Regions:
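Extracytoplasmic and endomembrane cell-envelope/extracellular-matrix remodeling and assembly machinery
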Residues: 15, 20-23, 27-46, 52, ...
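Short, surface-exposed glycine/acidic/tryptophan-bearing loops
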Residues: 1-17
Length: 187
């Protein structure tokens, strides 16, 4: 099954450099998964030279798209008969592109004051196993829930590093709490 913000399958994730173990799933690490997704998109663009084809392959896989191009003797993803999910996916990507290019035209108005302030985090490099992530969280001044919230790639209550170094994000306490004086009512 596909996991994380970028909905990567396990095989694709591993192919593009992500680690998946019993205690770690880097598909849920937004930064690492984004970098892996970008590597996939770059490879697909180098292969197809066409962004619609890249989008089709992101949904269906490069193997499937390459095979269908040959079987159907087609040159474009728009000329392929694909499953409905993939066809709809490509058109949704095209719609999102239009919205991003002209958000006001489609009724999307985001002002700076409407955006959430990012929560600053300290990065802690970990290269040894942690048997108790709850205790690790407490030692770093946060709850286990906050540790999981800011590090969704942690799959278990422990971290087995297997010789790798991982970066754990620790949110800064001063940024963690909602400040009501900064709130105003929208009419």
């Amino acid at each position: 099954r596909a996991v994380g913000t970028w909905q990567l399958l396990e095989g694709t994730a591993r192919q593009y450099g992500l680690t998946i173990t019993s205690t770690v799933d880097e598909r849920c690490d937004v930064t690492k998964a984004t970098e892996a997704a970008c590597r996939y998109l770059k490879a697909a663009y180098e292969k197809y030279g066409d962004w619609a084809m890249v989008a089709s392959s992101y949904n269906a896989g490069m193997g499937r798209i390459s095979g269908e191009l040959v079987k159907q003797d087609a040159d474009s993803s728009f000329d392929l008969w694909l499953v409905e999910e993939t066809t709809r996916y490509v058109y949704r990507i095209m719609a999102i592109k239009q919205i991003f290019e002209a958000p006001y035209k489609y009724g999307f108005v985001l002002r700076a004051q409407d955006l959430y302030k990012p929560i600053a985090c300290e990065s802690v490099a970990v290269s040894t196993d942690i048997q108790d992530l709850s205790g690790f969280a407490k030692k770093n001044g946060i709850t286990y829930a906050d540790l999981k919230r800011f590090n969704p790639w942690l799959r278990d209550r422990k971290l087995l590093t297997a010789g790798k170094t991982y970066t754990i994000r620790i949110p800064k306490e001063s940024d963690m709490y909602y400040k009501t004086p900064n709130t105003y009512v929208h009419n």
